[in-house]
Design a protein with these regions (language model features):
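Membrane-anchoring hydrophobic helices of lipid-metabolizing enzymes
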Residues: 1-78, 86-90, 115, 120, ...
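A conserved mid-domain beta-alpha-beta active-site/ligand-binding segment of alpha/beta enzyme cores
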Residues: 226
């Protein structure tokens, strides 16, 4: 039995080789250069093909309740963070033909070779400092008008975790101020021959209740999303790794 011990939900069980990678001061989240867009399109095609192969043939993921997404092109999708590579590919395959943008840690851009390509594939790195936050928020607001935005509110990868960690309200301001729906994507695990079977459940749409203040709406939406993920996480029937608090 594989047991891992943690102190808080902020603990990391997976770190990239360049965990302290910093964005350049002049980093641009939206690049309008036509040549950049052409290269990004060319790079995205083999990435998408590999994603389908990895998700369907290696991880053997089953998607449930995709019908809830059918009517929508732009929305925020909140997911539990439990697979190192799978969390990069599963949303792209699950949401196809829509191209999602995924909010990621800047450390991902420090990965040799592939790190430089990630922004072309839809990665939106979180800025390190306040001075870059305005442009980051502008990018999220623009992208959310036309595409799905994927957010992992738990922030840290806990491989094969079968419970939903408590998370902050911060990222729920985006769907509230942009008045777009939110959905959940909950990865669950069942016993397999060698590694767990993976079943992913979609749920939604979720909107905040008609409350007096933006702060109340943000909390209300966060609670709806959290409760949905907790509900669907109950479909996990096998603990490949057990997490215990110190």
């Amino acid at each position: 039995m594989n047991i891992r011990y943690y102190n808080t939900y902020e603990d990391d069980f997976f770190e990239s080789k360049n965990q302290n990678y910093k964005l350049k001061d002049n980093y641009k989240w939206i690049k309008n250069n036509i040549f950049y867009k052409i290269v990004a399109f060319i790079v995205y095609i083999p990435f998408l093909i590999y994603g389908f192969i990895y998700t369907k043939l290696v991880l053997k993921v089953t998607f449930k309740n995709k019908k809830v997404l059918k009517k929508y092109k732009n929305y925020f999708l909140y997911a539990n963070h439990t697979l190192e590579m799978g969390d990069a590919f599963n949303p792209i395959v699950g949401l196809f033909p829509n191209k999602p943008y995924i909010i990621v840690s800047p450390s991902n851009l420090g990965i040799p070779v592939i790190g430089r390509l990630l922004p072309m594939l839809g990665a939106l790195p979180i800025p390190d400092g306040i001075h870059q936050m305005k442009k980051f928020i502008e990018c999220i607001n623009i992208r959310s008008k036309t595409n799905p935005i994927i957010i992992y509110p738990e922030a840290h990868v806990w491989p094969y975790s079968t419970f939903i960690r408590d998370f902050k309200e911060t990222s729920f301001e985006f769907p509230v101020i942009n008045n777009v729906p939110s959905f959940t994507m909950t990865t669950t695990y069942q016993k397999g021959k060698k590694k767990p079977k993976i079943t992913i459940y979609f749920d939604g749409p979720f909107f905040p209740d008609d409350l007096d203040t933006k702060k109340q709406k943000i909390k209300n939406l966060r609670d709806k999303v959290y409760n949905s993920m907790v509900k669907n996480s109950k479909n996990s029937t096998y603990d490949y790794i057990i997490y215990k608090k110190n």
